[in-house]
């Protein structure tokens, strides 16, 4: 049965045979498909969300493989410690918690006993694993957004997920540097503030989206080391929206010592061509990628735009699809 939980529960009135069909659903999605309109949310709040969730779980029979709790931002979150404890005893495979709180919701220790987890998504939570926690041995996807966790605990958490393939980190709190040690990682998305990012043992990583709000390169070695650690990189999206001191442009080499031979798709956003750092960085990546097939460039309105496009075509001798945008005046150019 693939109906939303709200509609599935309504089928109980069809016949005696259908009455408890919904109670055996392996996937419970308590999100906007249940809450519906703002008016519905108000009704649920008055009825006490904790009681509603408890009633659903009490009636449910059989395993729960996937559970999602996504509450609107203006709703006071219910006490869900018992809920997570219940799920930990049901071999949960896919768990998503989106909790709208001013202060982060501290995850109970029971979540760290969900050793069958394959997918974990957390929003506005505080993560502090107990000392005895040995990791999620089966986890393949981890998404953390507005989560509070120390740099050391995050590094430990990632390194203790040996099968991790997909990692998403957005606006982490209390995390100044990140070390990612994930031998099976294929895809990495990052957005937020950070001082240091170290990629270690990520030889299979092929897709990276990097949107830093601060970025620092102290020497040519720093940039070289970043790209040497991801030899299998095929798809790169880098956002240059952040301001970078032009003095740091001296740390950008003409081209990387080791070519990015696997890189086929390159996306660079918010490039200011009159900014020496942005220009140096963009040209370095293009010169270092001999097998590029697709480039997407978003350039802040700039008098050097046409000249830059000409140079890109001159450098890239192979067949190339180029999508170029000027952001400020919304001009679009597509070359193929």
Language model segments and positions:
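Conserved hydrophobic beta-strand positions in leucine-rich repeat
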Residues: 28-32, 65-70, 93-98, 118-123, ...
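Hydrophobic, well-ordered secondary-structure elements that form the walls
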Residues: 285, 330, 336
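Leucine-rich repeat
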Residues: 1-165, 170, 189, ...
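Plant-skewed but cross-kingdom recognition/interaction modules and surfaces
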Residues: 125-126, 134-202, 224-227, 273-278, ...
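Short amphipathic alpha-helical interaction elements and helix-loop-helix interfaces
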Residues: 2-5, 24, 59, 73, ...
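Extended repeat-based solenoid scaffolds, especially LRR ectodomains
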Residues: 197-275, 284, 291
């Amino acid at each position: 049965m693939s109906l939303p939980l709200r509609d599935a529960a309504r089928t109980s009135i069809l016949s005696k045979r259908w009455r408890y069909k919904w109670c055996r659903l392996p996937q419970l999605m308590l999100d906007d498909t249940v809450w519906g309109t703002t008016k519905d949310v108000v009704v649920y709040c008055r009825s006490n969300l904790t009681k509603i969730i408890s009633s659903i779980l009490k009636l449910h029979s059989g395993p729960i493989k996937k559970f999602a709790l996504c509450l609107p931002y203006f709703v006071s979150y219910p006490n869900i410690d018992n809920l997570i404890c219940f799920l930990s005893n049901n071999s949960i495979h896919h768990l998503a918690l989106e909790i709208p709180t001013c202060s982060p919701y501290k995850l109970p220790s029971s979540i760290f006993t969900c050793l069958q987890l394959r997918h974990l998504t957390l929003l506005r939570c505080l993560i502090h694993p107990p000392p005895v926690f040995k990791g999620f041995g089966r986890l393949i996807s981890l998404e953390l957004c507005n989560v509070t966790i120390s740099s050391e605990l995050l590094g430990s958490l990632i390194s203790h997920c040996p099968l991790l393939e997909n990692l998403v980190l957005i606006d982490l709190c209390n995390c100044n540097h990140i070390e990612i040690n994930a031998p099976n990682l294929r895809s990495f998305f990052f957005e937020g503030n950070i001082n240091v990012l170290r990629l270690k043992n990520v030889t299979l990583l092929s897709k990276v989206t990097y949107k830093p709000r601060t970025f620092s390169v102290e020497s040519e070695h720093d940039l070289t080391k970043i790209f040497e650690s991801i030899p299998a990189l095929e798809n790169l999206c880098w956002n240059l929206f952040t301001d970078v001191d032009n003095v740091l442009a001296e740390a950008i080499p003409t081209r990387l010592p080791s070519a990015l031979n696997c890189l086929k798709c390159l996306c660079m956003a918010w490039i200011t061509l009159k900014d020496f750092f942005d220009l140096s960085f963009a040209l370095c990546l293009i010169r270092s990628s001999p097998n590029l097939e697709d480039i997407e460039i978003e350039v802040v309105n700039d008098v050097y735009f046409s000249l830059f496009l000409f140079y890109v075509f001159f450098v890239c001798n192979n067949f190339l699809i180029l999508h170029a945008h000027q952001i400020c005046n919304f001009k679009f150019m597509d070359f193929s």
